[in-house]
C-alpha cells in the first residue's frame, strides 16, 4: 500500500489533527485506493482553535468531524513544536477544495455546492464546469430559511452527490454538514468558508509569496484593517504556543 494513503495524527489542546506532508499526500489520503473517503473535512487555524476552546457546542461539532487538518500556519508551527519529528505542512482549504474539484471533474464524481451569494454561486458553477468539467448535480445559495433545510437535505440525498461543499462560515457550515449527514451520510463533506468568493475573483487572495512565508494573515489585515480585533484575539493563541501549553 502506498504510504500516502495513511497519515499520522497529532493532538493540540485535545483536538486531533491529521498530519499531511503536502497537498499530494492529502489527495492520496482522501482518494485511497481509488475510493473517495466519506466524512467531514474541517480546516483548523488559530482562530478556530480559540472558538473551539470557548464554545462547547462548536468543540463537539468539530471533534466529531473525521478529517481535521492544519489550514493555518500557526497550527502547523504548533504541531512541529509539540512533535519535533512531525512531517506536517499547511494545506490551505481553498487550495484543497480546488484540487478536489479538479479531481472530481477528471473522475466524474458528482458534486453538490451549498452557500454563497446567488450570483457568486452561479459563477462558481460555471467556472467549475468550464475549467474542470465538474459534474455538478445540484446547488443552493446560502439564502434559504431554516424551515427549508430538511427539503435541502433531501435534495442533496436525491442528487447522489459524493462531494458536498458548504460555504456558510463557521460554525454554521459545520452545523449544516452534521445535520445533512443524518440524511445523506455517503459523501465527503467540506466546509469552505469564503472559498467561492476567492475562486470567482470577488475576494483577492494573498500573493503566493505571502502564503509561502506564512504571512497570509498579515496581507488580509493590511487589505482589511477592520480585522484588527480578530487578529488581536489571536494573541491568546500565541501565548499557548510560546508557553508550550499545547
Curated annotation (Swiss-Prot):
* Record-annotated membrane-spanning stretches: none
Q: Which GO terms describe its biological process?
A: enterobacterial common antigen biosynthetic process
An annotated Gene Ontology molecular function: lipopolysaccharide N-acetylmannosaminouronosyltransferase activity
**UniProtKB keywords:** Glycosyltransferase, Transferase
Query: Which InterPro entries does this entry report, sorted A to Z?
Result: UDP-ManNAcA_Trfase_WecG, WecG_TagA_CpsF
**Which pathway does UniProt place it in?**
Bacterial outer membrane biogenesis; enterobacterial common antigen biosynthesis
Q: Top enzyme class of this protein?
A: transferase
User: What Enzyme Commission number(s) does the record list for this chain?
Assistant: 2.4.1.180
Q: Which reaction does it catalyse?
A: UDP-N-acetyl-alpha-D-mannosaminouronate + N-acetyl-alpha-D-glucosaminyl-di-trans,octa-cis-undecaprenyl diphosphate = beta-D-ManNAcA-(1->4)-alpha-D-GlcNAc-di-trans,octa-cis-undecaprenyl diphosphate + UDP + H(+)
Q: Which domain of life is it from?
A: Bacteria
Query: Per its database record, what is this protein's job?
Result: Catalyzes the synthesis of Und-PP-GlcNAc-ManNAcA (Lipid II), the second lipid-linked intermediate involved in enterobacterial common antigen (ECA) synthesis.
| Similarity comment | Belongs to the glycosyltransferase 26 family.
- What's the protein called, per UniProt? UDP-N-acetyl-D-mannosaminuronic acid transferase
Q: Which organism is it from?
A: Escherichia coli (strain 55989 / EAEC)
- Gene symbol of the encoding locus: wecG
